[in-house]
Amino acid sequence: MKTIKSLVFLPVCALCFGLTLNSCDNLEIPSDENAYPDLTTVDRNIVVESVTSRTTPAITDAASFEDYGFGKWHYGPGFPYDQRLDLMPAGYSLDAAQSKDKLLRFFALTDIHITDEETPASGIVFYPKVGNFGLSCYSPLMLYSAQVLDAAVYTANVLHKVDPMDFGIALGDLVNSAQYNEVRWFIDILDGKRIKPDSGIKDDPIPGPGNDYQDEFQAVGLDKTIPWYTAIGNHDHFWMGVKPVNDRVRKSVISENIFTVGNIFKDPNAMNDSLFATGTMDGSTPYGTIIGAGVRAQMQQIPKIPADANRRFLSKNEVMEEMSRTSTLPVGHGFIQTKEENSFNGCYSFEPKADLPIKVIVLDDTQDESEIRNDIYGYGTLENGRHDWLIRQLEAGQKEGKLMIIAAHIPIGVAPGQPVGWYNTTVENDLVEELKTFPNLLLWIAGHRHLNTVKAFPSSDTNHPENSFWEVETKSLREFPQQFRTFDILLNKDNTISILATNVDPIIRNNPFAALSRFYAIASNQIFGMVDTSNPNGEASYNVELVKQLTPEMQLKLRNYIRPR
């Protein structure tokens, strides 16, 4: 068994030294002992060290990652804010040093993918078949999704103490495959409960408490003074985020039988086929060994696993209803049951500060289960009902003189024709032009693509630069660099708006399993050959100051808000 010999970030206790974990000999984890006030990537950044070995280990051979020099990193200089004036008139300049009045501060995390790694209905069998998307099907870091979220919550609490947050929001893909136990783990971590990140029978791959990924732990819980909200992602109501749940997989997931499926990327009837056994991870082994994955015809038998009724799939409405079973605020975390339909609506809006003219419009732009597709269900879409609801919200906000932010899982205008984009480019382009007619719209925030991308949607009329908006995507909390963002909405002295979007790395000082996850996340990226060039600097992190013009009416209203007469 291999051990971590240097856990310099941990407090001195039984969990610190000589602890046997499913990790690597001499794994050096840089200390964030002096992380405060170096809390964001503006202050410091994770620098991935180059691999010199000519041998690349298999992604399934986590025990050898460190032996071949994979997963190593250290802290380096931070990334300053890149001031973006794309939406402003030609010749405009803004002194970055001038004083700014803060209107709103919040954090957003996305694509957390809380994962039951022992589910009999995984997508592990497909990881060698889909290129870089394979990382979404399998990686050793899947063992630690609960602990990474706990580290992010701890970090948000620390940031809140330094500079208070008005709210937090999760932008969808809270879980990996819409299972009840995954949804409960997500909510319970935010609520600060005892977490048992194990399913089936109790596993203890490394005997003793608090020393392996299956062991129970006490979640920190989000500071009770921070309200948190949620948006729906495709993984929150589709099997593995790609196919509607049918009776076959619904029965399999709570049974001892590993699910079998066809070619999910080409066959519309794949969920009723048995070409592949999807596989699972053996929770009794230190590294979560893959079992039961392969071409069905080439397997003598598929192993049975311990069944668990808590793995049952939840519908979209049931996921939203579960958000009401919480000890933190607001109850329901944004989702409101409508009396007319007797169901939950994945779209809602809220005003984070009673005296501030700004509202957040939370939009469900995932596909509907009733659609018939030959490929996957990861596209963005708005049918007439949701589209009309969005436009009514924007019209009301404009009429009432409120700044507006759209929060959705799937971004807009970024990947035409791709499974991570919108299903209909024409509809998407029309929506972009509609959005530009609402000058009080500041920002569309999203996840889904697991990128730190920023895009400007400038006005089509140079005489009205206010008819424009920004879009900011945020990285997945699961894969490297495992970040979330803070957003600061500021009023400049010239009555323009600055939006500071800042990447944050979770603090790992008190969380050895989050530290291991970071190591695995970096190694997995290196093994899959993934290079992030999703922003102008070609770096995984991207901090920006986004400047936006306001109408004369909103300039006056906000100036009076800051300095009332």
Annotate each predicted stretch with a short phrase:
Residues 1-11:
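Bacterial N-terminal signal peptides that target proteins for export
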Residues 19-23:
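C-terminal motif of bacterial Sec signal peptides marking the signal peptidase cleavage site
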Residues 26-160, 166-167, 208-209, 250-400, ...:
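Metal-dependent phosphoesterase/phosphodiesterase active-site architecture
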Residues 108-110, 167-173, 224, 229-233, ...:
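Active-site neighborhood of phospho(di)ester-bond hydrolases with catalytic His/Asp-centered motifs
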Residues 116, 176-178, 235-241, 369-371, ...:
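Active-site environment of divalent metal-dependent phosphoester hydrolases
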Residues 144-260:
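Core catalytic region of metal-dependent phosphoesterases/phosphodiesterases
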Residues 187-192, 220-222, 430-439, 455-469, ...:
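Short, surface-exposed basic-aromatic patches at helix termini and helix-loop junctions that form
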Residues 370-388, 395-445:
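Active-site-proximal segments of metal-dependent phosphoesterases and phosphodiesterases across multiple
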